[in-house]
Structure formats: C-alpha cells, structure tokens
UniProtKB/Swiss-Prot annotation:
The entry's keywords: Cytoplasm, Folate-binding, tRNA processing
Organism of this sequence: Vibrio parahaemolyticus serotype O3:K6 (strain RIMD 2210633)
Designated name of the protein: tRNA-modifying protein YgfZ
A GO biological process held by the record: tRNA processing
Function: Folate-binding protein involved in regulating the level of ATP-DnaA and in the modification of some tRNAs. It is probably a key factor in regulatory networks that act via tRNA modification, such as initiation of chromosomal replication.
InterPro entries in the record: GcvT/YgfZ_C (IPR029043), tRNA-modifying_YgfZ (IPR023758), YgfZ/GcvT (IPR045179), YgfZ/GcvT_CS (IPR017703), YgfZ_barrel (IPR048451)
C-alpha cells in the first residue's frame, strides 16, 4: 500500500542531529502472541523473566532457552489484546515458534505469529506523540488498533493493525524512516538482538539479559534454568555482549560481519556482530559477544577489512544483575 512506501533511509553522520520525532517501519521485527486460559502459567515455565508478576502497564525483556540454557529468542514481553505479545527479530520466529510450542499440547494456550505492523517512535517528542494516542501513565498502553510499548526514554514500539498504521502515518508529520535508525538506538542502548543466525549460540548472561532485568532468579523452574542459575551462582559464564565501534572503508551489508582481536603480533577471530549500524562518514557500530575478561583497550578489526580497526565502547549499564 502507498503508506508503506513513504519510509526511507536516513543517512546520518556521527555529527548530525537526530529528528525530534521519527517513526520507523520495523519490518525486521515480528511478534508471537499467546492467548488462552493457561497462557500465564505456560509462558512462565518457559522463559527467564517473571511472567506472573508482569503488570498490565509494564513490559520486560526475556529469553527463551533450550534445555542446556542456549537462547532461542530474546524478546520484549507485554500484555497485548487478550494475551501476551513477544516482539523479537522476525528471522528468529520460525524456529522460536516451533520451540515455544513444544509442550503447549498439554495446556490451554494458542501460540502463533502475529500479522500486526510494528512501528518505532523515537525522539524528544515521542512521549507526547504516544500520549496523544492514550494519556494513561503506564509504559504499556492500549491504542487504536493495538498497543504502545515504551522501550526507554523517548522511544516506543507500536504494534497495530495495518489500517491503524496507515492512519498514524497519514496523519503524522514525523520523519518516516526505515529500520536502520531504530537499530542504531538499540545498539547505543546495548539491547541484545538474536536473529536466526545467532540462535542457540549463547546463554542469557552472555547477552546481558540479567543486567537488563530479563532474568528472575526467584521464579522457580523454567527451560534452561539450571544453566542460567549456575552461571550466576558459580560464575561459569565467561562472556558478555559489548558495543564495538570503528571505521569501515566500504558499505556493510546483512552478511555475517566477523571481527578479529589482536593477540601479540597476530590476529585471532573473536566473533560475529549480532547487529550493526553504519553512519554516512565511514563510522560504524555494532553489538558482539566477547570474552568478558578482555581489556577495554583491546584492538579489534574487521576480518573483511583488515585496515579498519575497532574498539570496545562503554556500556550504558552495569553488567551486575542485582
């Protein structure tokens, strides 16, 4: 439809000001919904976060793991319609849907992928924009055609029907952008992004889920809980997610972007970016899981561009979980 073609990339340098209000079409994200009499108890027994205590006006990050504690999905959970919504990378949903439904046959619960449109509202005027849709004070609000979910200060996710999305876009004077700007904000906030290529690779603590309030250590059993608890109480986790920044001589695409680290006079592979954002002035940034004992001044470089060195940037939060 015509409204879907109005979004365009916003090419920003590291020095450019951000829009006071932007709406991004987040077609790289999708949502799994869960409804039914047993939705709360079933989901509570599957994921790292505390579903039982989640209030109607709250959202939380969480992870869904396999029995060995490896992450299938990192999601934002909130009340949506008659059940729950779990926003996550769209590419991860095919496998995650199969895994999260594995034991659902024993419960009164319906789990499926949503067809709703996901938009990202950001900027100093974002809160006012959402308040015009619903003046309630909560971080999760019912709006026409769906739900508004606060991610952080001046940043909201809108999950709405296509008709509602069209009305929002046609009646807004916001800067309309494609997903890249939202990805930049997620990287700057160090919010983990687990696409299909990163599924079943890391435990939740390696993705900093504990530092973001996405793990409850008091909720009881859930799939992968033993590994997650062992990582906390026995210190078995040796990895964490970091922001990395550097220069790039050519455009970065959606192919796997490998990094190497300096080891003496040599270079050794250190991992693959989970996600990345490229500025218009040859600067770029990304998220990557690294050993958590690396020095802050460890030299990194792009494997495909050996002359382009990168560094580890400061996280916006502590890696402690309490």
């Amino acid at each position: 439809m015509e409204w879907q073609t109005r979004f365009s990339p916003l090419n920003l340098s590291t020095q450019d000001a951000l829009p006071e209000l932007s709406i991004s079409r987040l077609d790289h994200l999708g949502m799994i919904t869960m409804v039914g009499d047993d939705k709360k108890s079933y989901l509570h027994g599957q994921v790292t976060c505390d579903v039982v205590s989640l209030e109607k006006d709250q959202s939380t990050l969480g992870a869904h793991c396999d029995a060995k504690g490896k992450v299938w999905s990192v999601f934002r959970l909130f009340h949506h319609g008659d059940g729950y919504g779990m926003i996550q990378p769209k590419s991860a949903i095919e496998i995650e849907l199969k895994e999260i439904k594995k034991y659902a046959v024993f419960s009164k619960v319906t789990i499926e992928e949503s067809n709703d449109v996901i938009l990202g509202v950001a900027g100093v005027n974002a809160d006012a924009f959402v308040s015009a849709l619903n003046e309630d004070a909560g971080d999760v609000r019912i709006i026409n055609g769906g739900t508004a979910v606060k991610v952080e200060a001046n940043r909201w996710l809108l999950v709405v029907t296509e008709e509602a999305a069209q009305a929002l876009i046609e009646n807004s004077d916001a800067t309309l952008t494609t997903r890249e700007l939202w990805t930049r904000f997620d990287i700057e906030s160090a919010l983990p992004f687990v696409s299909a290529t990163a599924q079943n690779e890391h435990i939740p603590q390696a993705l900093n889920i504990q530092a973001l309030g996405g793990i409850s250590f008091t909720k009881g059993c859930y799939t992968g809980q033993e590994t997650v608890a062992r990582a906390k109480y026995r210190g078995t986790n040796k990895r964490a997610m970091y922001i990395v920044k550097g220069v790039t001589s050519t455009a970065l695409n959606d192919d796997a972007i490998e990094l190497e680290r300096s080891v003496g006079d040599n270079w050794r592979s250190v991992g693959t970016l989970l996600t990345h954002y490229q500025f218009s002035d040859n600067q770029a940034m990304g998220l990557i899981v690294l050993p958590n004992n690396l020095d802050d001044d460890t030299r990194l470089r792009l494997t495909s561009q050996p002359d382009c060195e990168w560094t580890i940037a400061e996280l916006p939060y502590s890696l402690d979980d309490e």
